[in-house]
A protein has these predicted regions:
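Vicinal oxygen chelate
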Residues: 1-5, 26-75, 81-109, 121-132, ...
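Conserved beta-strand-loop-alpha-helix junction that forms the acyl-donor binding cleft
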Residues: 10-13, 100
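Long, amphipathic alpha-helical segments that form or neighbor coiled-coils/leucine zippers used
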Residues: 116-117
Length: 154
């Protein structure tokens, strides 16, 4: 068996597709009308159609349960954050935070209240610590990454 992708349910395909394309820079792989797959490896599916497929009432499909997130990485997190600041429609779970392992991330909601996390790649985190003068060993401890990974990032 092969896992293909996560699929999230959306109320308005046009609004959600615009969010993923314009806010998160995702590219559409396939547009099948009620289902849109993105090259990033996830899909959105129209709620009314999904409810019919699984045989439930639309109202039985939860909105914003806060029990999962889609995770993205952005090489230039600061530029992304600056771009977000100009978008009044973006609703935040929280602003940028530094996780205990040193990674900076922001969480926001998509139009259907799915949680979206955008963080910097761990390679960037490691390089930032090394640039601050941390040793390979200190960086590995601080980031919880193996020393070999830290050396490869140097």
């Amino acid at each position: 068996m092969k896992f293909v992708c996560p699929l999230i349910v959306v109320r308005d395909m046009e609004v959600s597709r615009a969010f993923y394309e314009e806010v998160l820079g995702q590219k559409v792989g396939y547009d099948l009308g009620e289902n849109v797959s993105f090259e990033g490896g996830f899909a959105i599916h129209l709620r009314s159609h999904f409810a019919d497929l699984i045989g439930v009432d639309e109202d039985d499909i939860l909105r914003g349960p806060k029990n999962a997130e889609l995770y993205f990485e952005e090489d230039d997190l600061d530029a992304f954050l600056e771009r977000l600041n100009g978008m009044d429609s973006v609703k935040y779970v929280h602003g940028v935070v530094e996780q205990p392992w040193g990674q900076r991330a922001v969480r926001l909601y998509d139009p259907d209240m799915h949680i979206i996390e955008v963080g910097e790649p761990m390679e960037s985190v490691v390089r930032r610590f090394l640039a601050r003068g941390f040793s390979v060993e200190e960086t590995a401890r601080r980031t919880s990454m193996p020393e070999e990974f830290v050396r490869q990032c140097a």
